[in-house]
Amino acid sequence: MAKPIIDDELWTLIEPLLPPPKPRREKNPGRLPVSNRAALTGILFVLKTGLRWRDLPAEMGCGSGVTCWRRLRDWQAAGVWDRLHELLLAKLRAADQIDFSRAAVDSSSIRAVGAGQKLGQTPPIARDPVPSTTSSPTPTVRRSPRS
């Protein structure tokens, strides 16, 4: 198996958040499933490198890219990533490790309760005394009289 991307301490935080494995069939149970830690290693490797799921190297021992993708999908549906995000933020806050001085707040993430100051009616733009070069008719070229 590939070197784990996450250390044991972080894994002990993540493991309880993962949903229990699906029960295996008694008759024809198929292959043994890939461990959650191996699948997480594959998921993080693909997301970090930008590799396509199908190009995940088999030598990593993370299962196929499809297996990792399915695990990612299932964990997303189970709310694992949201809970992990909340847990890590709480731990960082408790350790006073969050620096909000570099945070950027987007206007779409904070509701503007009131509108800006109301202005009067915008005055009409005065007509430009110089004719426009883009909308003036093309001058006709006069030919010299034929001799």
Swiss-Prot record:
What the entry lists under InterPro entries is as follows: IS402-like_dom, Transposase_6_like
Pfam families named in the record = DUF4096
Keyword annotations for this protein, in alphabetical order, are:
Transposable element
**Domain of life of the native organism:** Bacteria
Signal peptide limits: none
Query: Where does the record place the region Disordered?
Result: 106-147
Amino acid composition bias (Low complexity), ranges on this chain? 129-147
Homology family: Belongs to the transposase 6 family.
| Protein name as annotated | Insertion element IS402 uncharacterized 16.2 kDa protein
